[in-house]
């Protein structure tokens, strides 16, 4: 899933990446995946090579120098030794083949530069760790990557910071021009990726991107206020209003900047939920035909609302803020429209991999919406919703029964938080990959 995620987002930045680093987006993605494989699978792979070499060594005439030399060459004994007993599995340049400038921009020295006060960095243990923006550490002039989880979780934003830093050093573009181009490419790439994923989940659906509708009434006029919808999906008797938010989640320490984090939630989830709700409200006002327009006021779609039975409001974020998005409607500091489903592109990729029937996916969305409307249950992870659905495909009803049974014995519960409900989903993925 990581390769698909990065390819979706970085493909639109290919020209900019080539201008700054002289490489393609696919070279960047291949390097990240090679690092992932080396850190996660490298030890097991090299041990298998070592076992094969040992077995062949036992069958070889050890007094024959030529045979022993051929054996060392065949299995690359030096490479095995470096990976087993050295740091070869974590050597960024050797594994990725990236240019030195990119590796440098993503690396942090192991110690402060000479002349700095103190022998160690001053790091707040409960704050933002430097590794988030610098996934590599430089030791003895070489860059190493040791943490797979941080690399995959934060690489996209760390790469953006590296690109921006290198652009400033080389003065390739003005800072304003670089940021503007990146954001435009990012919006296009993320919306295109989300539309494609919904097209795979709901094959044959009508998918309309960047369409407009009147804010009030049902008649569109270029002289009256209108609102843009990122994606509208029509499948059978269902309509999905999807808003995509590519903005970065707040990069500051939540202990020092709680207001910044609240503002980020409002921008990424609250605003998107209201935009999606406005689209659904417009469609429901129309009787029976609802039209969607391009920016010039030309009708691009007509939806027969008399045949629509289910409407979904969905917010999709580029950044994974799962632990909050999964229960966004329960957060006291943002005002999310009731029934809104807030997910990340990561979650959508998981849905796309798991669901092979569009009707089952739509049934899951109905249960997911019901859970978000439930005032007394909350989840800490979007995949807990999917895990509960796999265990019981009417999980909101099951939870109600559990609450009623518990309350009949012990009294009223204000809120029940579910966590770690992904065992069956984990088993499914383990069986496929």
Per-region residue spans from a language model:
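Catalytic cores of nucleic-acid endonucleases
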Residues: 246-301
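Active-site beta-strand-loop-beta-strand hairpin of nuclease catalytic cores
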Residues: 233-241, 245-251
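Acidic, metal-dependent phosphodiester-chemistry machinery of nucleic-acid enzymes
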Residues: 1-188, 192-205, 214, 218-222, ...
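Beta-sheet entry/capping signal
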Residues: 206, 230, 237-241, 310-314
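Active-site metal-binding core of divalent-cation-utilizing nuclease and nuclease-like domains
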Residues: 209-229, 233-236
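Active-site-proximal structural scaffolding
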Residues: 187, 191, 224-225, 235, ...
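Extended, hydrophobic alpha-helical segments in both membrane/secreted and soluble proteins
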Residues: 194, 227-231, 242
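Short helix/loop capping segments that flank catalytic or ligand/cofactor-binding pockets
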Residues: 156, 242, 250-252, 324-325
């Amino acid at each position: 899933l990581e390769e698909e995620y990065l390819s979706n987002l970085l493909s639109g930045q290919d020209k900019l990446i080539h201008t700054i680093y002289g490489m393609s987006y696919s070279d960047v993605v291949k390097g990240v995946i090679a690092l992932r494989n080396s850190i996660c699978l490298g030890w097991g792979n090299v041990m298998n090579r070592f076992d094969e070499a040992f077995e062949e060594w036992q069958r070889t005439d050890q007094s024959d120098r030529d045979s022993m030399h051929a054996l060392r060459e065949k299995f690359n004994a030096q490479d095995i030794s470096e990976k087993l007993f050295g740091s070869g599995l974590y050597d960024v340049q050797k594994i990725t083949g990236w240019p030195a400038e990119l590796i440098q921009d993503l690396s942090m020295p192991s110690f402060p530069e000479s002349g700095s006060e103190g022998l160690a960095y001053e790091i707040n243990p409960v704050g933002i760790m430097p590794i988030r923006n610098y996934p590599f550490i430089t030791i003895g002039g070489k860059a190493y990557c040791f943490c797979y989880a941080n690399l995959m979780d934060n690489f996209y934003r760390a790469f953006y910071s590296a690109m921006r830093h290198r652009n400033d050093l080389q003065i390739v573009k003005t800072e304003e021009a670089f940021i503007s181009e990146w954001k435009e490419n990012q919006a296009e790439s993320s919306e295109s990726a989300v539309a494609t994923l919904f097209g795979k989940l709901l094959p044959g659906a009508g998918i309309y991107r960047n369409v407009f509708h009147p804010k009030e009434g049902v008649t569109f006029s270029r002289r009256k206020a209108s609102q843009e919808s990122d994606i509208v999906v029509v499948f059978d008797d269902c309509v999905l209003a999807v808003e995509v938010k590519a903005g970065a989640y707040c990069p500051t320490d939540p202990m020092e900047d709680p207001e910044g984090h609240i503002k980020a939630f409002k921008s990424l989830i609250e605003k998107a939920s209201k935009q999606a709700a406005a689209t659904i409200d417009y469609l429901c006002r129309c009787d029976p035909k609802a039209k969607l327009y391009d920016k010039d006021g030309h009708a691009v779609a007509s939806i027969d609302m008399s045949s629509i039975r289910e409407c979904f409001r969905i917010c999709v974020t580029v950044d994974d803020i799962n632990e909050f998005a999964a229960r966004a409607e329960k957060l006291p500091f943002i005002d999310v429209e009731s029934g809104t489903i807030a997910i990340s592109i990561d979650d959508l990729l998981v849905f796309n991999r798991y669901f092979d029937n569009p009707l089952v996916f739509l049934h899951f969305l109905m249960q997911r919406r019901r859970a978000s409307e439930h005032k007394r249950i909350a989840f800490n992870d979007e995949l807990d919703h999917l895990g509960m659905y796999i265990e019981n495909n009417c999980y909101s009803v099951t939870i109600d029964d559990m609450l009623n049974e518990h309350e009949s014995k012990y009294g009223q519960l204000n809120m029940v938080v579910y966590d770690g409900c992904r065992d069956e989903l984990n088993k499914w993925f383990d069986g496929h990959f």
